[in-house]
């Protein structure tokens, strides 16, 4: 047993220049575990609460209150606890907070400690984090969803959908998948440049061009980039969308004018489901995330019945990595996949519970970053530890995104012949 002797938090800056929290957990043997917490731009209403300071400093986005909660309340409780008792550590913090959404201490404070403790425990044993958390069965490298065109709340592009992603499903390994995705990313840059469009990137490293033709223009442009890179669109490369529909759901309608101006349409729930089905029929779209508003259960049901047998329907804002929300979705037969964001729920233990529930119900799991990231690469290890089979962590640019991809390259090398890359098998459409 190795005892925690120190828990210390500090305020650092994320990839958008906003404050976030970083936590150190130190054991009696002098072993350190360190974790930095990400932050989202488009957040679900049902997510655990990220504690911000308000006031003038950092435009109200400081996290010194969360830092103080770690350094006083949480530290006092955890010092003297075994670093290997992850469930106990997480439950102690949940009990200390005492709210259903972690609004007292802050999910950012609690998560930082939870992940730092797991890292310290892994380091104590001389194990990589993926092996400590996942045990001997942790060997699946995820297929990367590479976000190459940003829209919605992640850019200034006049497109409602937040992410247009490529899936290198015919890659033979994670290393090969990264090569394919990166080549297409550079090909897309040239395609956009030749059209006189901006090649500036959004929060997650994808391009944010002013595509006058909206969604279909983005998809057609990606198709051209894929082909110019020497790959087959619809075979070697498939498409995934993150609609982030909650971001443009207004007064019971899906209001595309919020991002697309006067060219955008306003759709009912039924029309939204029909529109997504039409896109999936026209383009090789294998996955759609948050195609409906997070509380539009009827809309989600209609969408699932319409295309859920052939398209992965991922719940992000819908499920917020929460077993209660996920359980409801499973009972209602809604969606068939869960997006996994550790900061939506706030502890490693609860994250693992959500992934296990999804697997037991036949739902797929997609490990995910947030738009506000740091150099912390914990989610790369967790994707392998939990055998998610898929990961969303941005484009082939920005060091905060590449940190995760590079860690996965290292893990694949370390696993050697035992590494498994699922390709199309990552998608178990019911």
Curated annotation (Swiss-Prot):
Q: Where is the active site?
A: 204 (proton donor), 341 (proton acceptor)
Q: What class of enzyme is it?
A: lyase
Q: Which reaction does it catalyse?
A: (2R)-2-phosphoglycerate = phosphoenolpyruvate + H2O
Known EC number: 4.2.1.11
Q: Does the keyword Transmembrane apply?
A: no
Question: Which keywords does this chain's UniProt record carry?
Answer: Cytoplasm, Glycolysis, Lyase, Magnesium, Metal-binding, Secreted
Could you give the cofactor binding note from the entry?
Binds a second Mg(2+) ion via substrate during catalysis.
Q: Which cofactor does it need?
A: Mg(2+)
Among Pfam families, the record links this protein to: Enolase_C, Enolase_N
> Any idea which GO molecular function terms this record carries?
magnesium ion binding; phosphopyruvate hydratase activity
Q: Which GO terms describe its cellular component?
A: cell surface; extracellular region; phosphopyruvate hydratase complex
- Family label: Belongs to the enolase family.
NCBIfam families (alphabetical): eno
What does the function comment of this entry state? Catalyzes the reversible conversion of 2-phosphoglycerate (2-PG) into phosphoenolpyruvate (PEP). It is essential for the degradation of carbohydrates via glycolysis.
What's the protein called, per UniProt? Enolase
* Lineage, uppermost ranks: Bacteria, Pseudomonadati, Bacteroidota, Flavobacteriia, Flavobacteriales
Gene from which the chain derives: eno
């Amino acid at each position: 047993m190795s005892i925690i002797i120190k828990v210390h938090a500090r305020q650092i800056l994320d990839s958008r220049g906003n404050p976030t929290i970083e936590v150190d957990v130190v054991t009696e043997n002098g072993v350190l575990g360190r974790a930095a917490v990400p932050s989202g731009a488009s957040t679900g209403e049902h997510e655990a609460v990220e504690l911000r300071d308000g006031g003038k400093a950092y435009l109200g986005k400081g996290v010194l209150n969360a830092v103080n909660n770690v350094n006083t309340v949480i530290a006092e409780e955890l010092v003297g606890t075994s670093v290997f008792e992850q469930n106990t550590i997480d439950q102690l913090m949940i009990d200390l907070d005492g709210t259903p959404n972690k609004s007292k201490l802050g999910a950012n404070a609690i998560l930082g400690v939870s992940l730092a403790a797991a890292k310290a425990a892994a380091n104590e044993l001389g194990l990589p984090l993926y092996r400590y958390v996942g045990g001997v069965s942790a060997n699946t490298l995820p297929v990367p969803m590479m976000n190459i065109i940003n829209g919605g709340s992640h850019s200034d592009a006049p497109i409602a959908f937040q992410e247009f992603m490529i899936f290198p499903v015919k890659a033979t390994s994670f290393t090969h998948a990264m090569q394919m995705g990166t080549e297409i990313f550079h090909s897309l840059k040239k395609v956009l440049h030749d059209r006189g469009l901006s090649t500036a990137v959004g929060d997650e490293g994808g391009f944010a061009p002013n595509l006058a033709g909206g969604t279909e223009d983005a998809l057609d442009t990606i198709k051209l980039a894929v082909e110019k890179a020497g790959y087959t669109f619809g075979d070697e490369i498939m498409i995934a969308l993150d609609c982030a529909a909650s971001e443009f759901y207004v007064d019971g309608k899906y209001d595309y004018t919020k991002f697309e101006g006067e060219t955008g349409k306003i759709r009912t729930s039924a029309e939204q489901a029909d529109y997504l089905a039409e896109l999936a029929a026209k383009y090789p779209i294998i996955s759609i995330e948050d195609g409906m508003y997070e509380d539009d259960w009827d809309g989600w049901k209609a969408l699932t019945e319409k295309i859920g047998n052939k398209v992965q329907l991922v719940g992000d804002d819908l499920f917020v990595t929460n077993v209660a929300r996920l359980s409801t979705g499973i009972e209602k037969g809604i969606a068939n996949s869960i997006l996994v964001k550790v900061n939506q729920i706030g502890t490693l233990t609860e994250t693992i519970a959500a992934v296990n529930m999804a697997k037991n119900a036949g739902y797929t799991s997609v490990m995910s970053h947030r738009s506000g990231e740091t150099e912390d690469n914990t989610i790369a290890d967790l994707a392998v530890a939990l055998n998610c089979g898929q990961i969303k962590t941005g484009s082939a640019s920005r060091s905060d995104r590449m940190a995760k991809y590079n860690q996965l390259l290292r893990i694949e090398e370390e696993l050697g012949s035992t590494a498994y890359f699922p390709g199309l098998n990552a998608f178990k459409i019911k």
